[in-house]
Amino acid sequence: MKYKVVIAYDGTGFSGWQYQENAVGVQQVVEEVLAYLEGEPVRIFGSSRTDAGVHAKGFVGHFRLTKPIPPKNLVRAMNSRLPESVRILKASYAEDRFDARQIGRAHV
């Protein structure tokens, strides 16, 4: 099952969105929670990348789970395990053709 999520995060203390070997990115903490829920590694694809210390509101990502979880339950489950600085604002099922990397972006 493919999901779309809308994420908000305070980038303070993070190396940016993208996973990095020697630092903690937001992607890493989200993927750790998804792996916990799925029981195996899950890759999330984000709509863009942010630099270290940059905040995001309305950041979009997509991923696949083999164990279906209703979107409202997914939001609650993820937020219960994520740090307070990272929140899942909304989750929904996504069409197979949806790709968060291909949507528009705006910087403020």
Question: What feature does the model see in each segment?
Answer:
Residues 1-107:
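Structured-RNA-binding interfaces characteristic of tRNA pseudouridine synthases
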